[in-house]
Amino acid sequence: ATETQNEKVKVKVETVSVQDVEQLSEFTATVEANIKNNIAPQTPFRIEKIFAEVGDHVKAGQLLAKMDATSLKQAKIQLDNQEIEFKRIDELYKVGGASKSAWDAQKTSLEVARETYKNLVENTQLLSPISGIVTARNYDSGDMYSGGNPIYTVEEIRPVKLMVNVSESLFTKVKKGHEVDIRLDVYGDEVFKGKVNLVYPTIDPATRTFPVEIKIANSDERVRPGMFARVTMSFGHMDHVVAPDRSIVKQSGAGDR
């Protein structure tokens, strides 16, 4: 045998160990508003005045826009007349001077007039149904609203929510209240805390996943709808055999083997 053949290969022995490894899964999602309301009247009106601008914070019940009040004024006159007429019929009915059918007919007319007036009040003064931020305004004062785009969009962003699709294999492990870590590309490695708010009860047979809704309190409003998010969920710890990375020899062209 040659000297080269007799040369022994030097081998360094490394010790493998069992370590407690956290079981993590990562998901991606787009941030959504907790509630999104499109605000517009039920029927066409001219917009008399706009009171809020994009970016404004508004409270529930705050006046956003005032529509032309011509129809409202006419409805108020009709309501007043119906109330007067009903009072007259009611007094006659009590003394036998009017029939029950006449009394019923007038009462129905009064109720219709009241409902019409109430509906016009709600559609003449547009109020925000939620506290939030104005994210869209599609009309100006003086414009004619005729349908299509809403006059305003208001979104509630305290909290915000994320929807992630989780593998069927984790169905029994995800529970309401489960705390998660969230990273947003715009904020780098900063971690935001969220909680599972809703676990959908069925599996999508096409993707073998189920939807999970996560909420972020977002009290400082730094997280905004549309941001790209990475969600990390922890599913406890398991013991795994761990070998030092330097002790692994990878074969060329063998991928991760």
For each feature predicted by the language model, list its residue ranges.
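Acidic, gly/proline-rich low-complexity N-terminal segments at the extreme N terminus
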Residues: 1-28, 128, 173-176, 181-182, ...
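Short, conserved beta-turn/loop elements at beta-strand boundaries and strand-helix junctions
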Residues: 18, 36, 139, 200-205, ...
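Surface-exposed patches in structured soluble domains
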Residues: 30, 44-51, 57-63, 127-186, ...
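Edge-of-domain interaction segments
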Residues: 65, 222-257
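Short, compositionally biased
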Residues: 72-88, 166-172, 196-203, 243-252
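Short, solvent-exposed secondary-structure boundary/capping segments
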Residues: 123, 202-211
